């Protein structure tokens, strides 16, 4: 059976996927999880998830398959972190690696990410990553604001736009979770709000709004319906039929209801991937409509 570690999860243009590393065999397997029924059981032991190549966007396993000590904050060991060489707040000092210097000199975009009418975030990413960065964050709609020749030029725009009242530079996962489980999203409404913000607040010309929901779930009714927060969330199991994933929140259907369960804290942990088994049952308050 071997020891398996969840080394990555994300939503691509082909939907939600996870990567499982077999630590004994030294192999990594990608799994498309939408439409699959499973339970992921998390164990306390943690291992390095490996390095990421900023230029090719490729991930590689940690050669030593390094175990991570208790209380260690990162998901990569120091050697793999050095190999990656990424410092997201490069503009605050702290040194820039050769890898990051090369990456910073590639074209970057400034984007507006929409989470709710009151939660608009401005950020930057390399033009090569573009939409994938938006999907990683779980934005529901988005708009590209500027195309710049480098990260430095993009960062100047980001700093300027983020100083605007009511515009976020970052959003906590707990806020994203609350919005996902309490707010309904309408792309037409989001588009109108983004256009107005870009034109009136930023003084820029709006570009075409991007609808991101179609990547999170193939079934439109999933995100159009209610996403529930379980009354009894588990910190060690995510279970059910996976009907999509928004950012790092897996959408798991049980007994006809869809629950959001965060997988972010499972990354770097040893896990059991129990295919076809539902080993944990979520519960939630009755639907409002059923009270009458």
Stretch-by-stretch model annotation:
Residues 1-292:
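Non-catalytic accessory segments flanking enzymatic or RNA/DNA-binding domains
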